Amino acid sequence: ALFAVPYTMTDASQVHLVAEDEVGNRAEASFIDKFTPRPITTDTIQLNDAYINKVVPEIMGQSPEVADQGDPVKNYVEINRNLRKKNAATLVDLAHKSEPRFLWTQPFQPMPNAKITAAFAQRRTYLYNGKPIDQEDHLGFDMASVTHDAVPASNDGKVVLARFFGIYGNAVIIDHGYGLMSLYGHMSQLEVKEGQMVKRGQELGRSGQTGLAGGDHLHFTMLLQGLPVTPVEWWDPHWIQDRIARKLGAALPYHP
């Protein structure tokens, strides 16, 4: 099985393997012997009325689960905080339906010729009129290229979401099997449908600035059992070979 340690965890002894038989006998043990806490960087996002009045109506118009707070700034916080949580819960639900087989055989690849403008595990404080109104964690990589650039699939898999998806705007999520997924957000247009099988490098759509995006870019992240994990490791063929393929052996038909 593949599992992820939450990016906020500082003590791996909190992770336990639990076994229980049919009559309720239960055994529990810690099994992680090497763990390095992930540093969380910080950033400040300056909000203005022009940005808020652009993103809030679009998201609320396509997200009926967002309760209108009667004020654009309050609506922004409702989206940034509570819709973000609902989106995260959906990611966990999707993981429960992941294919029980590996759908990929090659290393994952990033968007080509793109500049990274924001990285994984960045704690953002949002300021409006100089005062903090929210704080949330950015859990992916923002990758900017030319406007409406082609967005390729990072690896083979099955499209499990292709629609407007809350804070991510127009988004695609690919299931790579056993709870491993990749997410592509803020796209201007989508070229794939839910249920479709895609190949590594196949165009999924075009970059854009839908959802909470302030400019044209791709928000990309990897997910394991619904938990965001840093894409950097999955882009590294040596990391996959050492941490995944070597341990799984013939169960993973990996060809770096």
Language model regions located:
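Catalytic cores of peptidoglycan-degrading enzymes
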Residues: 109-255
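Non-catalytic extracellular/periplasmic "stalk"
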Residues: 1-122, 127
